[in-house]
């Protein structure tokens, strides 16, 4: 509180004013002394008030620094492993998050942990490097009070459980010796629906809609490497196996969330190429056209350099496939992939395979590979789906040699896949999920909100963990932070 003081008032007589009596020399000195003392006291009080405000301000900053807490989360994805280092604090009993550079840092290393299926011990190298990165951003005195977790996603979900556990045990060994607070159960493979929920939390936290009317929230459609997630609040009845309920503040949200495993960009492309290769075996010359790869591409040229485990064995396709980029044919081929198994649908709505999907409603953010594809083609954020079709047609129909020259700074691994990505995006969002091409309620994004918070599911996992450290979510006990 700022001290309240009344300024001292000192009356000084005008220099030429006639006095009714004679002022003695002693009295004159006393008056001068009084003035000096009064001015000194006034300046002293003003200085005290100024310093008090400075101390209060500095004290608040120091208090926040003293209360700063840290959390480390390692996202073990299909194409790479990324560490997130979070700094946060509490004010009035509520957590305060700051995802700016001062209190948040991340680093990604390739390849993903799933690529170590044949050599689990190899996973320790990248995890150790990520732990060292985290240590450089957290004060040493806070190590024992800072938790570290590892959450693996679709790439690991595709592996057999025994192989998953072998890789996880290697990572646990590294995390146990990290110096951070860790428990073995904090390194695990999360479900696809959980991943979708975390992404939804990140987006709605960034947009400021957490804690508001559920139907005013924003949905997420996310295209990863091994899986695709669809997550939103639906007014329809959702079967319990497809719904999750979370609480934020005083509001409960019942959310449709599903992860379409094997329908991520890399996994779907691999599946398509394998289907084409199998069909080539039944042709006279043993060769079939691949409509999703630009003409002139040689399949075994760059496969050894691919960071994605899904395309690392591309050289096996040489001789059976001929690149013949054609957007319309690629769109048809990818749509056929998405319809497989639909005849087994037991629900009213099955947009992809035999999986229940309610009609999409409200606004949506298209993230991950949806974003990268739209960004590559420099599409407008509104109505971008309608622009993607002509852009995809031009790109797919171009010669590979010309594309390399046109995009010299783009990694050939990604350049080779944009024809497929463009067609697959239209097949999934428009042909399967029913989003109109001119629908402006869906935008592509990698960040959201006034603070441009990254749309990364790991941030949502961190937020939910801090907000509800002791609650039970999806049948799994949340960890206790230890403070």
From Swiss-Prot:
Topology of this chain in the membrane: Single-pass type II membrane protein
Location within or outside the cell: Membrane
Catalysed reactions, semicolon-separated: a ribonucleoside 5'-triphosphate + 2 H2O = a ribonucleoside 5'-phosphate + 2 phosphate + 2 H(+)
Enzyme class: hydrolase
Cellular compartments per GO CC: membrane
Sites where a glycan is attached: 250, 281, 305, 326
Documented EC number(s): 3.6.1.5
Keyword Lyase appears in the UniProt entry: no
Transmembrane intervals: 30-50
Active-site annotation: 195
Residues at which ATP binds: 72-82, 219-229
Family: Belongs to the GDA1/CD39 NTPase family.
Cited function: Catalyzes the hydrolysis of phosphoanhydride bonds of nucleoside tri- and di-phosphates.
Protein name: Probable apyrase 3
Source organism: Arabidopsis thaliana (Mouse-ear cress)
């Amino acid at each position: 509180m700022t001290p309240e003081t009344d300024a001292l008032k000192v009356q000084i007589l005008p220099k030429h004013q006639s006095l009714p009596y004679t002022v003695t020399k002693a009295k004159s000195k006393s008056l001068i002394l009084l003035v000096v003392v009064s001015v000194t006291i006034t300046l002293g009080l003003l200085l005290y008030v100024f310093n008090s405000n400075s101390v209060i301000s500095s004290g608040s900053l120091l208090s926040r620094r003293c209360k700063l807490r840290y959390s480390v989360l390692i996202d073990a994805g299909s194409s790479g492993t990324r560490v997130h280092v979070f700094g946060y604090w509490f004010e009035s009993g509520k957590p305060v998050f700051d995802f700016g550079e001062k209190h948040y840092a991340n680093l990604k290393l390739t390849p993903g942990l799933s690529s170590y299926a044949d050599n689990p011990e190899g996973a320790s190298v990248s995890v150790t490097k990520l732990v060292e990165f985290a240590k450089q951003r957290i004060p040493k005195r806070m190590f024992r009070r800072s938790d570290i977790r590892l959450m693996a996603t679709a790439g690991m979900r595709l592996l057999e459980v025994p192989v998953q556990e072998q890789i996880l045990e290697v990572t646990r060994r590294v995390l146990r010796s990290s110096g951070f607070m860790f428990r073995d159960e904090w390194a695990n493979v999360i479900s696809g629906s959980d991943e979708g929920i975390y992404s939804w939390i990140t987006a709605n936290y960034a947009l400021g809609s957490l804690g508001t009317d559920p139907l005013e929230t924003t949905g997420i459609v996310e295209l990863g490497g091994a899986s695709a997630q669809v997550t939103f609040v639906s007014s329809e009845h959702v079967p319990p196996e497809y719904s999750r309920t979370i609480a934020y503040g005083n509001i409960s949200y019942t959310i449709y969330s599903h992860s379409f495993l094997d329908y991520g960009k890399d996994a779907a492309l691999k599946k398509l190429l394998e289907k084409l290769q199998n069909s080539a075996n039944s042709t006279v010359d043993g060769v079939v056209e691949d409509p999703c790869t630009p003409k002139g591409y040689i399949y075994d040229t760059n496969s050894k350099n691919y960071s994605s485990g899904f395309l690392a064995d591309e050289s096996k396709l040489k001789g059976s496939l001929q690149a013949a980029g054609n957007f319309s044919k690629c769109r048809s081929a990818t749509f056929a992939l998405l319809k497989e198994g639909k005849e087994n649908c037991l629900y009213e709505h099955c947009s992809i395979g035999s999986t229940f999907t309610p009609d999409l409603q409200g606004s949506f953010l298209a993230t991950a590979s949806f974003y990268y594809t739209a960004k590559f083609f420099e599409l407008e954020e509104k109505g971008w789906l309608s622009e993607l079709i002509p852009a995809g047609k031009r790109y797919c129909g171009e010669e590979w040699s010309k594309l390399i020259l046109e995009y010299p700074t783009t990694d050939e691994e990604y350049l080779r896949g944009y024809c497929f990505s463009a067609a697959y995006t239209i097949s999934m969002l428009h042909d399967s999920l029913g989003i109109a091409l001119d629908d402006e309620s869906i935008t592509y994004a990698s960040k959201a909100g006034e603070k441009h918070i990254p749309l990364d599911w790991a941030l949502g996992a961190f937020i939910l963990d801090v907000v509800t450290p002791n609650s039970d979510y999806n049948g799994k006990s949340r960890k206790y932070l230890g403070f």
